[in-house]
Amino acid sequence: MPSTDGKVWLQMHDFSQQHGDFACGSLLWVHTIVIGSAKVAEDLLEKRSANYADRPRSVMCGELSGWGKIMLLSNYNDWFRSHRKMIAREIGSYATVAKFHRMIEFETRRTLRCILDDPARLQAHVRKNFTSIILRISHGYVTQEGDDPLVELAHTANAQLSMASAPGLFYVDIVPLLKYMPSWLPGAGFKRKAKEYAAVLDDLVEIPHNYVKSQLAAGTALPSLSSRILGEPGLTDELEDSLKWAAATMYQGGADTANSVAYAFYLAMMLHPRVLKKAQEELDSVIGTNRLPTFADRPSLPYLEALVTELLRWHTPGPITMRRTRVDDEYNGYFIPAGSFIFVNIWAILRDERTYTNPLEFRPERFLGDNPEPRPGNACFGFGRRRCPGKLVDSASTSDSEPFPGYFLGHSALWLICAQALGAFDISKPVENGAEIVPEFNLVGEIIVHQAPFRCSIKPRSLEAEALVRQEFSLSE
């Protein structure tokens, strides 16, 4: 595992190891609590969710750069709730997600062909796959072959979001009064940087929204969240503004988190060839080698289901979640003043030895058998009132006792890309000068993290598998 240098979640884990699962301190003169266990997180963020649903103030990111209107950074208010309602209506039940299965299969097969043709650009292909899926649902936008401007726009915006939200990087987050400095003064470079970030965010919101409006005017709009609401009678300026930001939340947030986990899948398979082989054996025994798996095969592939669940535990895209208390509270005799910063260490919760046996191992078997270990659940998809609005979209049940747990839209797409990639490709460490190159598990980023770029050997399992990828792609067009 990486060192603690620059990894906030590892530093917080060390802090919890010294001071306990409910550790108090001070950050920027604000009372701060670091939560290091699922029990404490559930006691506060679930059972007392009304008091733990807001975000800490972010001057650089939320105010100067404008990201505070995105659900990720918005406080829990009417604005947040209206966005959640819009998104949940679009992807909030098994039936609504099932109608997207064919489209998800099309985009996944398109990605397999791209990986087959140019495996060196794996990260770009993965990024485009999930962004394409989200854009179809949020704006009815079909990405073009090769590099697509809206895919690249989301990538740029998310990189800037990560910079703008980095703890302690900008002095204005420490001294908020600095936000009123004229941008031409020495030391006010953050104002110019914020203006740059805000311009990209404006493009992220406005360009796809205006695309939908032009398609509606031409009578060529595809079904989407945006086209549905824009086409309803009685649309007000206020509702349209809310819609723009709700759709942008899907476009930005859904794509970034799913991309992060999907890219990590290839790293996991390189580092754990035993798991790859076992998953391929299950696929071959259940569906054979004359086709690629589809969503209809999902209930018959329990090991693959466990593999995807373990992937979410092993590489959660959001290692830290942040909240702020609205009113005074008390927990186990400790006073929690209003306005306290709450940091929940998701990374630590998913590696807690009290919950998971040998938690640093990638072992899907932990979720199978008569006594499975707890699935990631809330730790992956959010606690309380800030839970991902699409968390339950792939199951009719909310119970964690169900054999196929409901996750969010990205989980469905993630399952399919894992299933079809395993059916089509052998994934292994690259070899250079006769020696294997062993990649490192190295997370980079702040709010949403990604694996640092790595080299990977991806080859068709056979000539028949290569032909199958191309055939499946052409049949789905």
Q: Residue ranges of each PLM-predicted region?
A:
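Conserved cytochrome P450 K-helix E-x-x-R motif and the immediately C-terminal K′/meander segment
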Residues: 2-20, 203, 291-332, 353, ...
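Classical protein tyrosine phosphatase
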Residues: 34-44, 53, 140-145, 149, ...
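Cytochrome P450 heme-thiolate monooxygenase catalytic core
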Residues: 56-64, 98-262, 278
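Central I-helix of cytochrome P450 enzymes
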Residues: 130, 197-209, 232-284, 311, ...
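Conserved cytochrome P450 K-helix/beta-meander segment immediately N-terminal to the heme-binding cysteine loop
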Residues: 344-371, 473-474
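C-terminal helix/juxtamembrane-tail motif
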Residues: 451-477
